[in-house]
């Protein structure tokens, strides 16, 4: 390591003596403006270095640099356990977290694309009347002058304004006009002096057209004439309450002008930014208030099996003796409706007819049926029936587009904002690039179009072309959220910063990883230091500098085992190097299992699936692969998991497919193991989840000193009163409310963070109290309990070590676990139960998340162990090492979004490697 005197802080960041968590007082030199990968086995200390040390110190220094007034709102940030960091720049962390749980947040709002779209439509959008399709314009003084200029020379014009009058008080009106200096009126096309009308005692009749004459002139190219003309037109608009007219006195032709924004008898709203905002009451749909969804009748609940026709009882609510009368009535009265056609094959118009009917309240449509139920809510059976079919549904007014109807009348080159936010991003970009605009509009929109297109290009580069602008943020996966954040950062073009990313390749097919690397290099090339915590081999190869933390996890890690480029890493003696060079490898299984029984999915159509049939082998390791957005999760989660849950009687919502068949004897349970947190309580931890803590509490309650004090197992729990600290209620920390500032968390002064009362801590087992046990890592605890022959506890904790989580502390809060760690804790809990459980189908969503090659080896061993116990395992995965170990691969594709949703391949990894159509083939061939 270079001495501190040699460090050039313009070119390097120097981390001195980092000792947070398991980091062993390490010094790290990081080159600036480079792409740096921090790698190492799970739990070796990568995140402690990248996020908890470098990023945390960058944040702290930024906050310290603010005024004391600004700092009071931000709370004090703790200094990380590091002596010093020299050359540190402002730091930005982009982590694997879903951006927002706010139902109003969308891909468009979080990337700012929608903000620019709103501006674009407000600035250059043209409003068209829904009646005639003509453009709505309002006239200005200049428009009237331009019309006069465009006419032939010396044409005599009469400028008039319509007169609003009351027949009874017409004389008073004439008097007021005379006092204002006006002298003439035009009555039914004929000129008359105001004084003449007064002297005749003229009384108008109903329906007469009377205009006030403002001016008479012929056009002259003269400055003073133009000034007079402008004043006259201004006055005409004022007197006519926004209307005026020019009459050619030679030909009698009249041209009407209005400075109101109206056409076809409709007064339109003038577009502005708020008009297109669904977060503003002015622009939001009045029915759903901008959410896009309402609590209403759920189509999926009313028609659970879309493969049936109306005649075959597709409508679940029209079954039974009484309600089936509605079905019979509909069949009798429906004109030209295909009653034998499956629901999913009906056109939009035919579905509308079934739901809305012919518009009459007597027609037996579905909407009228539910209206009848609502009108009879005093009957309990109708209330129950109605609740059965209610759910969150698309808003019937805006159809999920969130905006008021009038916004759809504003268009740019024939496109309204609704149609653009519905398009997949890979279709929206070419549409934006091909807009035909006038030179004037081009000048206005130039910057806006640049911001929109660059952001869209970045989103496409990180493999998100299948998303739409309108997609809500809380429906995205962690990987998608992170890549959206990444694209947003690139769009902001911030330079001179340190970007720290947490495994951006998660959820990406190897093909998309190549594009991601390009994006990371772009971020580096504009003048940033990009630090990536990553296990992906391709990202490592592309890095300028690699830092390997190890050698193992937990207390066996935390050391800097290598720092240098990829070429030098190959010669190093580290686990990463050994796997990269093939000195250690994940071996291909000697033989693949041949399945005898299958799950048969027929006619899967949800989202982008193209009516596909899929056969999935049981009692095997099956991998579902395909590029990001091809339809893997839809097939596995929305169709397979939901249907099996329905058939097993444990809930689930029916998707759009014909049928799912499986042998009941081989699937008694189904478990979807995704990356959602395992517990929301801050007291939830891995040992409570695995039920090992029950045995540990039992053990302590049996100690001699515990019996003397009358302690039961509950005294060693931090979830109930008894032995836990009364001040912090077993949390170990106390949250202090700071009113207008962020709450501060302080260590509890009573128990000093141990969570228990002092007298409970006096109970010891082999010199360790309950707090000491909770602070042990899984590896340390296993050694400790093995020595003491506590086999029951060892049996429950061993699976945590098997899935590569030996570095976790027993009492570590579940809220601090990453998505990948939470998923592996769930896997460990099934390995504990696996021996006794009935045959189960396990569906894993990317279990390799956050795993080093060495940990993947352990994961595969655990998955194979489940299959050996007679269970079935399906894995949605992109990691080539897991794919090559599968008994069967089903590749969905060929592309993402509407270009995907087909079965490209099904068979063994060897056969896939030879397949020409699959994007996966090339990457698996390299591994076999």
Where are these regions (language model features)?
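Conserved phosphate-binding elements of NTP-dependent enzyme cores
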Residues: 1-928
């Amino acid at each position: 390591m270079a001495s501190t005197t040699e460090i050039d802080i313009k070119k390097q960041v120097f981390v001195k003596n980092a000792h947070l968590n398991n980091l062993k007082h390490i010094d790290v030199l990081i080159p600036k403006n480079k792409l740096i990968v921090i790698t190492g086995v799970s739990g070796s200390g990568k995140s402690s270095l990248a996020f908890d040390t470098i990023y945390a110190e960058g944040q702290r220094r930024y906050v310290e640099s603010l005024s004391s007034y600004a700092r009071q709102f931000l709370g004090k940030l703790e200094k990380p356990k590091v002596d010093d960091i020299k050359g540190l720049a402002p730091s930005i962390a982009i982590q694997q977290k879903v951006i927002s749980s706010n139902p109003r947040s969308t891909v468009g709002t979080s990337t700012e694309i929608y903000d620019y779209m709103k501006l674009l439509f407000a600035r250059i959008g043209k409003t068209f009347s829904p009646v005639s399709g003509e453009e709505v314009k309002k006239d200005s003084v200049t428009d009237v002058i331009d019309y006069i200029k465009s006419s032939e020379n010396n044409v005599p014009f009469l400028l008039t304004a319509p007169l609003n009058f009351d027949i009874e008080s017409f004389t008073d009106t004439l008097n007021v006009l005379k006092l204002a200096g006006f002298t003439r009126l035009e009555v039914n096309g004929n000129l008359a002096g105001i004084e003449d009308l007064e002297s005749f005692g003229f009384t108008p009749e109903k329906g007469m057209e009377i205009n006030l004459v403002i001016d008479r002139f012929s056009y002259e190219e003269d400055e003073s004439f133009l000034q007079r003309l402008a004043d006259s037109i201004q006055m005409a608009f004022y007197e006519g309450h926004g209307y005026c007219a020019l009459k050619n006195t030679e030909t009698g032709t009249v041209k009407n002008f209005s400075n109101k924004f109206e056409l076809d008898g409709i007064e339109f709203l003038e577009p502005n930014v708020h008009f297109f905002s669904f977060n503003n009451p002015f622009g939001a749909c009045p029915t759903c208030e901008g959410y896009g969804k309402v609590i209403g009748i759920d189509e999926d609940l009313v028609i659970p099996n879309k493969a049936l026709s109306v005649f075959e009882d597709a409508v679940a609510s029209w079954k039974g003796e009484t309600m089936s009368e509605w079905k019979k009535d509909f069949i009798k009265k429906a004109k030209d409706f295909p009653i034998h056609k499956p629901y999913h094959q009906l056109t939009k118009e035919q579905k509308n007819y079934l739901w809305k009917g012919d518009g009459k309240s007597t027609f037996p449509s579905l909407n009228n049926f539910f209206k009848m139920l609502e009108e009879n809510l005093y009957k309990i059976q109708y209330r129950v029936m109605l609740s059965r079919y209610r759910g969150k549904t698309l808003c019937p007014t805006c159809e999920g587009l969130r905006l008021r109807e009038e916004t759809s009348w504003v268009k740019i080159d024939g496109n309204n904002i609704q149609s653009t936010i519905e398009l997949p991003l890979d279709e929206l970009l070419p549409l934006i690039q091909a807009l035909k605009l006038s030179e004037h509009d081009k000048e206005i929109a130039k910057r806006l179009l640049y911001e929109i297109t660059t952001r869209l290009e970045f989103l496409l580069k990180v493999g998100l072309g299948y998303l739409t602008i309108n997609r809500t943020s809380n429906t995205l996966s962690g990987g998608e959220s992170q890549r959206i954040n990444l694209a947003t950062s690139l769009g902001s073009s911030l330079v001179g910063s340190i970007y720290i990313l947490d495994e951006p390749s998660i959820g990406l097919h190897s093909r998309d990883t190549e594009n991601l690397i390009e994006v990371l290099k772009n971020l580096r090339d504009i003048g940033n230091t990009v630090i990536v915590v990553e296990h992906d081999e391709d990202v490592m190869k592309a890095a300028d500098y690699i830092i390997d933390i190890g050698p193992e996890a937990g207390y066996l890690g935390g050391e800097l085992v290598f720092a240098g480029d990829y070429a030098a890493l190959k010669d190093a003696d580290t686990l990463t190097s050994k796997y990269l060079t093939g000195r250690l490898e994940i071996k291909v299984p000697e033989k693949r299992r041949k399945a005898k029984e299958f799950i048969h999915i027929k006619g899967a159509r949800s989202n982008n699936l193209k009516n596909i049939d899929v056969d999935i082998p049981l009692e095997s390791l099956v991998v579902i692969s395909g590029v990001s957005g091809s339809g893997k999760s839809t097939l596995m989660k929305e169709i397979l998991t939901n249907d099996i849950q329905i058939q097993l009687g444990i809930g689930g919502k029916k998707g759009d497919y014909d049928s799912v068949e499986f042998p009941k004897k081989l699937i008694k349970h189904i478990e979807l193991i995704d990356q959602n947190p395992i517990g929301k309580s801050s007291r939830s931890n891995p040992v409570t989840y695995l039920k090992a803590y029950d045995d540990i509490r039992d053990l302590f309650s049996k100690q001699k000193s515990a019996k003397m004090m009358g302690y039961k197992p509950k005294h060693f729990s931090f979830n109930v009163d008894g032995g836990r600290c009364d001040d912090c209620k077993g949390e170990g920390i106390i949250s202090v409310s700071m009113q207008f500032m962020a709450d501060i968390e302080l260590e509890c002064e009573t128990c000093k963070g141990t969570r228990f009362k002092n007298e409970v801590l006096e109970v010891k087992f082999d010199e360790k109290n309950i707090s000491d046990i909770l602070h042990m890592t899984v590896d340390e605890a296993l050694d400790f309990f093995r020595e003491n022959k506590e086999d029951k506890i060892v049996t429950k904790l061993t699976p945590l070590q098997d899935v590569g989580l030996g570095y976790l502390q027993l009492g570590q809060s579940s809220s601090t676990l990453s998505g990948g760690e939470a998923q592996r804790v769930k896997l460990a809990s099934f390995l504990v139960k696996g021996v006794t459980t009935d045959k189960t189908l396990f569906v894993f969503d990317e279990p390799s998340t956050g795993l080093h090659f060495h940990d993947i080896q352990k994961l595969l061993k655990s998955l194979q162990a489940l299959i050996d116990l007679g269970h079935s395992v399906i894995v949605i995965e992109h990691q080539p090492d897991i794919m090559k170990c599968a008994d069967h691969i089903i590749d969905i594709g060929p592309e993402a979004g509407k270009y995907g949703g087909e079965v490209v391949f099904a068979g063994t990894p060897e056969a896939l490697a030879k397949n020409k159509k699959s994007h996966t083939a090339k990457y698996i061939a390299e591994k076999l």
